[in-house]
């Protein structure tokens, strides 16, 4: 199932890339690409390595249902706090980066998808070894967003639909995930902020590892957009996406 998701991660961007570059101007596509790079960092913060540390916690607790519910609640609270911190950081970036400031509506809409990812609980389904849930929700999320993009995005005036449709796809995925949680009879129970803070400290090493290995992919785009026009971001981003797609195959 996870192999299927790996294929989907290649296919969906390759479907939208030629379409968006055709219907959007170079400048608008540069905005799309730059905000996407920013959101990759926001997503790293919100994930904070819980895909690894959270999965480990779920595996250790899966034979104790009450403890399992507590682990889910504690990690959820920690990720909500991370999302709040990421949003504050994003507001700071909007204040100092002209490209984001000029497209504040687009940027804030794009963050909605990052926030909704808090409620996807991939670490839980990995921990209980139900990988098919992760794959199905990903395909549903990206499939809906991709299909709606072809329907609603036809020119620069439709640019706000790009993050909005991503958010719609994510919302559908969240609903599907909560249906699966109900099937597992999981009721989320929050403990305390101090417990959530402990979860963050335990997961920091995984976050640092992820940051070191994956963050640099978007760093060049981030720096280019901070100092150069959106058109330069667009050209750079298209090249990097094509290179990334080829590298994924090997």
PLM feature spans:
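Transmembrane helical elements of multi-pass membrane transporters/channels
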Residues: 1-14, 141-145, 162-181, 193-250
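C-terminal transmembrane helix end/exit motif
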Residues: 54, 121-132, 153-154, 170-192, ...
């Amino acid at each position: 199932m996870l192999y299927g998701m790996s294929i989907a991660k290649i296919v969906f961007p390759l479907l939208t890339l030629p379409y968006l570059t055709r219907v959007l101007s170079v400048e608008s596509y540069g905005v799309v690409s730059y905000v996407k790079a920013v959101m990759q960092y926001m997503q790293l913060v919100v994930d904070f390595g819980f895909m690894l540390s959270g999965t480990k916690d779920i595996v250790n607790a899966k034979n104790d249902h009450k403890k399992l519910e507590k682990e889910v609640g504690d990690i959820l609270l920690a990720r909500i706090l991370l999302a709040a911190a990421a949003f504050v950081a994003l507001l700071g970036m909007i204040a100092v980066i002209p490209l984001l400031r000029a497209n504040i509506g687009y940027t804030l809409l794009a963050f909605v998808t990052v926030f909704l990812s808090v409620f996807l609980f991939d670490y839980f389904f990995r921990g209980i070894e139900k990988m098919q849930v992760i794959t199905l929700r990903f395909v549903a999320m990206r499939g809906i967003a991709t299909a709606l993009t072809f329907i609603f995005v036809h020119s620069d005036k439709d640019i706000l639909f790009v993050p909005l449709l991503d958010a719609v796809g994510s919302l559908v995925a969240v609903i599907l995930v909560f249906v699966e949680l109900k099937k597992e009879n999981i009721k989320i129970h929050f403990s305390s902020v101090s417990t959530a803070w402990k979860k963050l400290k335990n997961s920091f090493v995984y976050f640092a590892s992820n940051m070191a290995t994956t963050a640099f992919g978007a760093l060049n785009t981030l720096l280019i957009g901070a100092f150069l026009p959106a058109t330069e971001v667009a050209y750079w981003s298209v090249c990097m996406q094509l290179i990334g797609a080829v590298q994924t195959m090997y």
